Amino acid sequence: MKKLILLILLLGLPSLQAQDYFPAHSEVKTKQEVYKAFTNATLHIDATTTLEKATLLILNDKVVSYGLKVSIPANTITYDLNGAHIYPSFVEVFSDFGVEKPKRVSSSGRSPQYEPTREGFYWNDHIRPDTEAAQLFSYAKKSADDYRKAGVGIVNTHQSDGIARGTGLLVALDDHSDASKRIIDDRSSAYFSFTKSVQSSQSYPGSLMGATALLRQVYHDLDWYSKGNIETKDRALEALQNQRSLPQLFDAGANGNTVRALKIGRQFGVNYSVLGSGDEYNYVRELKQFTTPVIIPLNFPKAYDLSDPVYAEYVSLKDMRHWYQAPSNAKILSEHGIRFAFTTNGLTSLSVLRTNVSKAIERGLSESDALAALTTTPAEILGKQSEIGALKPKMKANFMISSGPIFDVKTTIFEHWVNGHQHVYEDRNTPDVRGEYTLNLNDESFTIAITGTLQKPTVKISKGDEKLTVKSSFSSQWLNLSFSDSLGQLYRIAAKKDNTLLKGRVVYANGNSTAISLTP
């Protein structure tokens, strides 16, 4: 009997131990949801709607409401913006952010390679629609920071390799989330180009004409394949077939290739959104025949140095004309009713993004069209206009807080909120001391010009045509200056912003001091 009882206890032991796997209900805790309200803001809901002294209310990663009179729940953290501007995050539609770079294949010899190297795929290695950016992606924190500083909070990225490049990935640039929250769509779009893959040495196509012919052949083969006319499974065509419902993006390049790509799309019923090269002003009449927005770069060419007559001979009239016309490209498209999105693709530094948009505005582009080209239009291209590109209820809480109008060169981006998470760049309470002031001391008049950034202003002092050497620092809202006039008289100044003035004291070399005001 004792042996029987012992046997029963031993048999029941595993089941008793297994109970520990399940968590006890006593450990479950209720998490209170905390709202965030941004009050007294100049709120840009989208490219055409702006509210003064407004409130934006968010919960977690979503916008709850906005307006002049918003009901704020009890469990809310409130941020008084004191007139600062809120803008939707910019959307980058054509990037390779965080995606593994393709590895260039080494040539095996001098004889051309005609056969493909990938079994079970299309007969040409440069057709790679099976590439998935989601499988090659690693969040690049430093690069994400550069994007956010420029105003970009959402990036559509892919591996820029091949004629058919596969699917892209839509990512929110949030350092405080993991992939489950950052990735908005792991199959956001399908990418194409006229450029061969660096991962293959296959010779064909060897020209733009060949690339165009190959792409047309792909669509003919896809149509034949999708009707079940081929028994052999082609993994590349299968992938392409599964991408037909995705937004189609095309990297066309220069010299009229934008129109060439659009014509291929029209032939096969594909609505490409085409990345051009900034010379679309040359093809306005042709572009007006198509309805999909074009994607235009902001990499305006630098002015040519023609001081060297030998070098000047190599600068063509075409190059000079493009240097002059490139900043007007967006305005010309807008005037002709051609919709467009801006891209950072091709910029050597993201820091010039807003500067170059400002140049386009100086050439006549409206600020609302410029903002739409960075927010609502790229969101529409990606079919995500109900989620990103604006700040309406149930949309993603992706926005930046700035000191003024976003395309003003003096404006500073204080913070960038992505997925409802704060990324701070400047102290919002820092007074803006920048400007040109006049200082009168001992019957002498000095001009003080303050430029630079909000946190690190740059100071220049002059007396008439004479430029004086100055040492300056800015800390805890105080501007400290030290300079000497032409007679060697030393002045040390400490001043603080007071409405439009800078008020403080000047200390002379003998130790005496007096109150001063720097007037704009």
State the predicted function of each range:
Residues 1-24:
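Bacterial Sec-dependent N-terminal signal peptides
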Residues 36-42, 428-447, 456-465, 472, ...:
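Tryptophan-anchored aromatic micro-motifs
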Residues 464-500:
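Contiguous, well-ordered beta-strand patches that form the walls/edges
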Residues 32, 40, 102, 110-122, ...:
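His/Asp/Glu-enriched, well-ordered alpha-helical/loop segment
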